[in-house]
Every structure is written in C-alpha cells, then in structure tokens.
C-alpha cells in the first residue's frame, strides 16, 4: 500500500510543509513588525487575517460548539479523501493528495490557533479577491485536477 501511494504521500507532505513554512514566516513577521499589510506589486499584497470559517471565510461562527463540530467534520472529510486517494490512480491520486495536503495544513491551524492565517491578497483595479493561503492553493488545484479527471471519465 505504501509503495503504491508513495507519490500521493510526497504531494501531501510537500503541500503541508510549504503551507506550514509560509504561515510561520508570515506570523513571525507580523509578531516582530506589527500588522502585516505589504504590497509586493500592483496585483499582490500580503495581508494577514485570521479566518475562523472555512474557505474564503465562509461559515465563520462565534459559537465554539459549531466551530468544534466544523473542525471534526473537516477531519472526517480528510479521512474520506485519504480512503479515496488509496483507491485512485494516476492524476486523480495527485488531485486527492493535493486536497488532503492543503486541508491538513488548514486543519492544523484550526486545532492550534482556533483559526486559519490567510495572507495572500490578489487585487486588480481596487477589486480584492478573498484573502487565502498556500494550503488553499493546493486545495483549489487538487479540486481542479479532480474535476478534470471526472470530465475525462465522462468522455470515455
């Protein structure tokens, strides 16, 4: 089982490590220099916010019971995705691994910080997209790969 899923585990580990390192750097910078709000170019800012919801701040709760329930639900979904990754192959396995790696990064923050640090702020002509993090990038890419794989299955 390990040999068959080796690449999947490598992708999970890469996603998790890149996410953790980026968040540690951003949080340390913010703790050292105060609020982080830095423009890197006309389209990209670094702006640390703490997200108590899920992707893009959705389902943010003040009630701790709902927050804990949501965290356990996310852990359950990660376990289901891991099971699906074991049963998949090829590009689909990479899609599941990418989603799992990003999800593990975000759920780790939920457990240790009770929120997820988001800091990548894309904008164009004053329109700002939702602030996100490296884990969200891996989750999004993984979902895109899985959607692509589903379309390829339907063509056959």
Language-model segments: what does each one mean?
Residues 1-156:
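Alpha-helical transmembrane bundles and membrane-interface segments of multipass inner-membrane proteins
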